[in-house]
């Protein structure tokens, strides 16, 4: 006589056995404590976050007085509310930096968008990919971002920001007052460290910082300051493995010879764009446009066109670049490219 065995069905649970809840991807994310991404109600302190400690999160700074605040990392957005007499450094911000109801603050920061509302007496060394905007604010002063530490270049990439897209001086005032100017540019000889000093506390000694212009991750440009000369030169570099390095090398050479860097831009171009900007020379560059965005540089100074040609032919022989052909048409080259760039930004 045989024995009869029955298997327990999978749907049946052994006595005392509890069904485990399902785990979803959003349940497995690392829990974020908002307190780790906030400085609030501080007074007379030096605080900050080291590289890797913010890692693209949002950050809030509020109700701080007489504080030195350093965020040595990239973030999503940062709001600064109700702060007085503070020194603030912000690494690259993917979205917006928004100051509200702050006064007597000195800052160095990089972001996609910069907004100031209900503030007075801010001094800002800025890298901003879009037009900085102020509203209901007075005595706001701007200079070009000028800062270096080893992790900063990678943080710009993580934040999706180009070091060449910086219109720091193209400020728009939403609430202008007739006969008054609510914003201005910092003195040309302003020393960044006099405004935003390198932190000397033990926590930040490991961050190898420099505020020298020739080491700044973001090229230091004149922006809308008056040009020294009537002669400018446009140089456009096309995408390859060394485009950024070549642009930096060319800037170093030209600035080292006494020329000024007025403005920079990194953006994609189509065939019709190249034909409009480069005109009869466009056919020389059409195949290069598919490789990636171009980098444009405007240099200013007497004999800028001649010197650009000498440097490009001597240092970058074999690398295709557009360089203004002669000084009589160089200003037209600059206008054609940057007018095109402004139109693209408005689309």
Swiss-Prot record:
Residues 1-22 are annotated as: Disordered. GO terms for molecular function: GTP binding; GTPase activator activity; magnesium ion binding. A lipid is attached at residue 3 (S-palmitoyl cysteine). Residues 1-11 have a biased composition (Basic residues). Found in a complex with ARL3, RP2 and UNC119 (or UNC119B); RP2 induces hydrolysis of GTP ARL3 in the complex, leading to the release of UNC119 (or UNC119B). Interacts with ARL3; interaction is direct and stimulated with the activated GTP-bound form of ARL3. It comes from Mus musculus (Mouse). Myristoylated on Gly-2; which may be required for membrane targeting. Palmitoylated on Cys-3; which may be required for plasma membrane targeting. Gene3D superfamilies: 2.160.20.70, Nucleoside diphosphate kinase-like domain. It is a lipid-anchor. This is Protein XRP2. Coiled coil: none annotated. Belongs to the TBCC family. The gene is Rp2. PANTHER family: PROTEIN XRP2, XRP2 PROTEIN. Acts as a GTPase-activating protein (GAP) involved in trafficking between the Golgi and the ciliary membrane. Involved in localization of proteins, such as NPHP3, to the cilium membrane by inducing hydrolysis of GTP ARL3, leading to the release of UNC119 (or UNC119B). Acts as a GTPase-activating protein (GAP) for tubulin in concert with tubulin-specific chaperone C, but does not enhance tubulin heterodimerization. Acts as a guanine nucleotide dissociation inhibitor towards ADP-ribosylation factor-like proteins. GTP binds at residues 95-96, 112-115.
